[in-house]
Design a protein with these regions (language model features):
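Extended terminal and domain-junction accessory segments
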Residues: 8-9, 17-49, 110, 115-131, ...
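Active/binding-pocket-proximal capping segment
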Residues: 307-320, 451-485, 520-523, 532-537
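A conserved hydrophobic secondary-structure block that centers on an alpha-helix together
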Residues: 171-188
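Short strand-edge motifs at loop-to-beta-strand transitions and within beta-strands
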Residues: 174-178, 279, 328, 336-340, ...
Length: 544
């Protein structure tokens, strides 16, 4: 059967059954938020074995089967210091789950609609089905190969460092070795898989864990006395019948779950904190705690609110501030981290939630999402709050040598004949192509332009950046932090908007890496580009 015959047949039959909209998972709550296990460096070295395994776990009173790091959800917190050598032996022991295994399963692959009449996802699905039909033998490989990314660490992208182009097959091991620079800012980073086309599937399983770089901010007297909590927010998509993460195509819609699946897989979305659903976080009245929060979400932005409390932010994406900045709420796009101090108010129970937010999906915003409960009780205390912190990194006083424009676009209609696509400069990701070439030791400004209805949180590997201009913020949207001195490694691109970032390519790190949308289904569908960092003085173009 050729492609034309197949498409005609599927169109005539209505592309089989309709896609079911996943429901919000039933939750349990009331348990105290648990601390994650931690592993710390000693004598300048952290040597750790990370087993990627498929194992049963309990999630909200339900037995599920997930891919995990060492059987834990999420993985252990790795504590290191600037100048350390971080050695991770990654062992791939994934057992494939949730994969289409025969043509009977795959025939009902395409169906139905999104919740917005402007988007004809059926046509896109037909093309995607055909592409997968032609390469269906690779589906299992896409699901069970893996690798590792140390998100935010300013380390070499070359082997044995943060090489995201590696493909580590089942029963294979790989020894990573990361030389953490002596000037790595002290703060919160994280690790997760980065195998292109399967990244979303693996992070939906909960494959993630925090990396804490200790340093000067930890010695601030008031902070040193505080209770510290590291909180990983996962977003987990679990099928109702198999209790596994489905391996299917997804198309965006509105509602509790941000997409429909092809083939239709009735499923529920769970958003646990440290592997727990709706936990309690207990504090004494007047107590100040330091919270480190990572949005290890493949898709959803977390507009974090704590009812009745101010969040005194002390760092973003691992890089500290000079002084605390009080905020009524903090927006965490997928992959962002925020560190803040919270001082408990009067005794009582206070909601911790992600406020309803419109990421640009057809049909409207994601609804409000409860995350946890702050429980204030016990003896009154009065924890001191710091007024100053540490000197943050400064942008070097160098000229901007080059200015570039990158255009981000998407198509979920299938009208291009290429299926569901997310593109940069009109191109899907190609590992063999160099999309952008830069010179270490220089500063560039990039203007990112969004021709899409969706927000795209753009992540650049290795080097953080500062945002100097944002245009197109939706009217009335108060979630944006546009302070020009804040450093980011992931920043949201407004729908049909743009922003300009300024980035210093540190002189001691060269090699090939990537930049991409951190809505991981978008990255898997093509919205990623390759970045080659040349040694200083060896940029082939010479001057600007």
């Amino acid at each position: 059967m050729n492609r034309r015959t197949f498409l005609a047949l599927m169109a005539a039959t209505g592309a089989a059954g309709a896609v079911g909209n996943a429901s919000t998972a039933a939750h349990v709550g009331g348990e105290e938020l648990r601390d994650l296990p931690e592993v710390s460096s000693a004598n300048g070295i952290l040597d750790y074995e990370l087993n990627v395994v498929t194992n049963p776990l309990e999630l909200g009173g339900r037995q599920v089967t997930l891919e995990t790091y060492n059987g834990q959800l999420p993985g252990a917190a790795l504590r290191i210091r600037p100048g350390d050598n971080l050695r991770i032996l990654l062992k791939n022991r994934i057992v494939p789950v949730g994969i289409p295994t025969n043509d009977v399963f795959m025939l009902p692959y395409c169906a139905s609609k999104s919740n917005d009449a402007r988007y004809d996802t059926r046509r896109a699905c037909l093309h995607d089905f055909w592409n997968r039909w032609e390469r269906r033998q690779t589906l299992a490989q896409e699901a069970i190969d893996t690798n590792l990314h140390t998100h935010g660490l300013q380390v070499s992208p070359q082997d044995p460092g943060d090489n995201v182009f590696l493909q580590i097959g089942p029963l294979n091991d790989h020894q990573y070795s990361y030389d953490v620079p002596t000037d790595q800012p002290a703060g919160l980073y994280w690790y997760h898989p980065h195998f292109h086309t399967a990244t979303a599937h693996q992070v939906w399983n909960g494959l993630s864990g925090p990396i804490i770089v200790e340093g000067d901010i930890d010695a601030v007297p008031e902070i040193a006395e505080m209770r510290e909590r590291t909180i990983v927010i996962n977003e987990m998509w679990i099928a109702d019948d198999s209790a596994e993460v489905p391996f299917t195509l997804v198309a965006p819609v509105a509602g509790p779950v941000p997409f429909v699946s092809f083939p239709s897989v009735p499923a529920a979305m769970y958003v646990p904190l440290n592997g727990q659903l709706l936990p309690d976080i207990t504090m004494q009245p007047g107590e100040a705690q330091r919270w480190r929060v990572v949005a290890a979400t493949p898709h959803r932005s977390i507009w974090l609110h704590v009812e009745g409390h101010t969040l005194h932010q002390i760092g973003t994406d691992g890089i500290p501030y000079a002084s605390p900045r009080p905020r009524p709420h903090i927006m965490l796009a997928a992959a962002n981290r925020a560190e803040f101090i919270i001082k408990a108010g009067e005794p009582g129970r206070y909601r911790i939630y992600a406020e309803a937010y419109d990421q640009g999906h057809p049909g409207g915003p994601r609804p409000r999402l409860p995350l946890a409960t702050l429980v204030v009780r016990g003896k009154q205390v009065n924890s001191p709050m710091p007024s100053t912190l540490v000197e943050p990194p400064r942008m070097p006083d160098l000229p901007v040598v080059r200015r570039r424009t990158l255009v981000f676009s998407g198509d979920i209609t299938g009208r291009t004949g290429m299926g569901i696509q997310f593109l940069i400069d009109g191109k899907e990701m190609d590992h063999e192509r160099i999309d952008t070439e830069v010179e270490a030791g220089t500063i560039e400004e990039w203007t990112l332009v969004n021709e899409d209805i969706f927000q795209h949180p753009i992540h650049i590997h290795v080097n953080p950046f500062q945002v100097v201009d944002v245009q197109g913020i939706p009217p009335g949207d108060t979630s944006w932090n546009t302070e020009p001195d804040v450093w980011w490694d992931t920043f949201r691109l407004p729908p049909f908007g743009r922003y300009t970032l300024r980035m210093y390519f540190r002189p001691d790190i060269t090699g090939k890496t990537v930049y991409h949308c951190h809505i991981l289904p978008h990255e898997d569908r093509g919205m990623m580009g390759t970045l080659l960092i040349d040694p200083h003085g060896q940029y082939p173009g010479g001057g600007p």
